[in-house]
Each structure stands twice: as structure tokens, then as C-alpha cells.
Amino acid sequence: MQMIVTVGVILFGFALGVLQKWIDGSPSNIFPLLIQQLDLRNYFGRFAIWILLATCISIYSKSPLRASINTFLFFISMLAGYYLYCNYVLGFLPKAYMMMWVMISFATFFIAYICWYAKGEGVIAIIISSAIIGVLFAQAFSLTQGFYVYHLMEVVTWFIGIIILYRKPKEFVIELGLSVPVALIYQLVIPYWG
């Protein structure tokens, strides 16, 4: 069963990579107005959706090792689909940019192992889930240069992250409370990365 899930993750990643590059390489006016207004072309080029997908793959895996393997294979297959489309359909291959994403994909192996514990019990699980929600919060809202929304889709992504990492009410309040300083620190350390 785990092998079937892993194959599904690989196929999903590859298809998402091809879809992302197809959207990215298509004129925006071919899409319905709603898709244009939601700015899906750029949404997939920012980090929030990938953080959310990696979190989902991690926390719903059977073990921390399986979370690492599935998340890593998702990102590698997504990059394969993205850059194969880029090379063979669009006729170019940005190697330096590709290498940056490959390095991030390797990092996800270790990060996913830790994220698997976010749905667990206790203080460590609350801290991990707070960090995830905080990073998603930092992707959705500006906290350091006035409070405003960066992008609507990132707000939706943050809200979905809250739903999947929801805990008992008392723990949930702590989780959300801790996520705010995480978001603030994130924006102070890497203000424009996302």
C-alpha cells in the first residue's frame, strides 16, 4: 500500500510540474477571468502552495521516514515534469534556477521528517505546527511594513494550513499564538523570500 501511495505522489508531482510550467508558459488571456484574477500563474511560483503540499504529504504519511521519502520524491518528480516541459516544449532550460530548486528538494527530505510530528501530541508537535502555520502566515500577510495581504491565494493557503493542523481548542490557541512571532521572525530574517 505504501508503494502505491509513493507512486501516486510521484505521478501527482510530475503532473503538477507540467501543469505549472504549462500555465506559466501560456498567455494569461487564454484562461478564464477568475483564474487570471486569482493569479494562479504566479501562485505556483511562490512558496506557500509548496509548503502546504509538503506539509500534507508529510503529516499524512505512515512514518517520518515515509514522509521524507514521499515529500522528496514529490518535489523531484515535480521538478522533472516542470523542467522537461521547459526543455522539450518551450526550448530552454534555466540550469542555475533549476539547481536552486533541486537543493531545496533535497532539504525537504529532512524537513518532512520533522514535519511529520506536527500532527502528534505534546509541546514539540505544537511548536512544529506553529512554525508551519507561521511561515504560511508570513507568506500571506505583511507584518513588518504595515499589515496587509500579499496575495489572496496565500491567505487561502494559510487558512487550509490552519484547518489541516487544527488541534484541541486550548492547543489551537497556543498554536496560533506561537505562529505570529514565527511569521514576524521569518519576515525580519528573509523579508522578500516567498
Question: Whereabouts are the PLM-identified features?
Answer:
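Membrane-interface helix-boundary motifs at transmembrane edges
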Residues: 1, 57-69, 117-125, 165-175
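Hydrophobic core segments of alpha-helical transmembrane domains in multi-pass membrane transport
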Residues: 8-18, 135-139, 159-164, 180-184
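Hydrophobic cores of alpha-helical transmembrane segments in multi-pass inner/ER membrane proteins
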Residues: 47-58, 104-116, 156-162
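Membrane-proximal helix-loop-helix units in multi-pass membrane proteins
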Residues: 84-150
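Membrane-interface helix termini and inter-helical loops of multi-pass transporters
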Residues: 25-35, 86-95, 192-194
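Membrane-helix boundary connector in multi-pass membrane proteins
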Residues: 141-152, 158-174
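Juxtamembrane boundary at the C-terminal end of a transmembrane helix
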Residues: 183-194
